[in-house]
């Protein structure tokens, strides 16, 4: 029997697969209603801000040959409504499922306010601090690119809440290792990486960008080598748990990310091809591990053999 159980701060995962933040909304999108979320290791909810936000102009999503470009923005009803309606319903339906809430904001005070309210609700097991979303003009982008700011923000949130916090890193930086170290210095319990890579595509007939917001975040197959490289670099400087993401669409991808240094993974863009991608990946994982003669998935963490 292959062991796929992974124990991370605040998150006791029956398997290392979860949806990336935003993928399944607050557990209320059609795909999330089509299967039992208990089949996954955890549920990660959409980024929550202090007040309701409407997101970016349409079109918000462009499906590319090898990935997805999105500028959805942090559309959510605000933290109070997320707790009273969305999370209460999700927790009622899934009493034992580990739930991670994603925290966003325009200022340090925003982040602290949202984190405190989510922590105090008793409805979630861990917080993911979204310092990296490249979609919103006044949003998290600026926080995630400066090591000093990341450290300070992490410290403030850590002092304000009892829950474990995972800082979600943006790849749109000069040195990802420096930012990861800053998160660790600030007291992060773990790291999520990578968020989307800032990009743009243009329609040659109209000469207009494909997205209403012009630029957006690239995810999917195209960013996988970037994600694997960055996770590997960060794993070499920290023992913090890493939740890896960026182009995962198969159980084999999961193994590759774990070899690079991830402890668990999040699946996002693969759901555009297969709305039950995370479920299918989790189901296929034991057989893939068995093929490789692996008895415990935890034994693979960071075990890449460099040339």
UniProtKB/Swiss-Prot annotation:
Keywords carried by this UniProt record: Cytoplasm, Flavoprotein, FMN, Oxidoreductase, Pyrimidine biosynthesis
Any one GO BP annotation for this protein: 'de novo' pyrimidine nucleobase biosynthetic process
GO molecular function, one term: dihydroorotate dehydrogenase (fumarate) activity
Record's protein name: Dihydroorotate dehydrogenase A (fumarate)
Binding, substrate: 46, 70-74, 130, 195-196
Cofactor: FMN
Entry note: cofactor: Binds 1 FMN per subunit.
Record: active site: 133 (nucleophile)
Subcellular location, record wording: Cytoplasm
Binding site for FMN: 21, 46-47, 130, 168, 194, 220, 246-247, 268-269
């Amino acid at each position: 029997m292959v062991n796929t159980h992974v124990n991370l701060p605040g998150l006791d995962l029956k398997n290392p697969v979860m949806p990336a933040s935003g993928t399944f909304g607050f557990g209320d999108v059609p795909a999330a209603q089509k299967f039992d979320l208990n089949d996954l290791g955890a549920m990660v909810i959409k980024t929550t801000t202090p007040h309701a936000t409407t997101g970016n102009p349409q079109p918000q999503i462009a499906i590319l040959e090898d990935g997805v470009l999105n500028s959805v923005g942090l559309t959510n009803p605000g933290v109070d409504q997320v707790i009273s309606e969305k999370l209460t319903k999700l927790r009622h339906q899934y009493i034992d499922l580990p739930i991670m809430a994603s925290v966003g904001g325009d200022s340090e005070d925003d982040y602290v306010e949202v984190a405190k309210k989510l922590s105090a609700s008793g409805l979630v097991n861990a917080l993911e601090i979204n310092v990296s979303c490249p979609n919103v003009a006044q949003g998290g982008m600026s926080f995630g690119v400066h090591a000093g700011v990341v450290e300070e923000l992490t410290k403030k949130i850590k002092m304000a809440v009892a829950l474990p916090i995972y800082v979600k890193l943006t790849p749109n930086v000069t040195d990802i290792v420096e930012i990861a170290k800053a998160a660790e210095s600030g007291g992060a319990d773990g790291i999520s990486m990578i968020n989307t890579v800032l990009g743009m595509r243009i329609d040659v007939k109209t000469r207009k960008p494909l997205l209403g917001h012009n630029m957006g975040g690239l995810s999917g197959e195209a960013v996988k080598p970037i994600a694997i490289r960055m996770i590997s670099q960060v794993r070499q400087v920290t023992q913090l748990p890493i939740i890896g993401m960026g182009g995962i669409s198969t159980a084999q991808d999961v193994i590759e990310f774990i070899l690079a240094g991830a402890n668990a993974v999040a699946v996002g863009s693969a759901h555009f091809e297969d709305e039950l991608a995370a479920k299918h990946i989790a189901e296929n994982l034991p057989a893939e591990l068995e093929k490789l003669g692996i008895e415990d998935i935890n034994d693979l963490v960071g075990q890449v053999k460099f040339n």
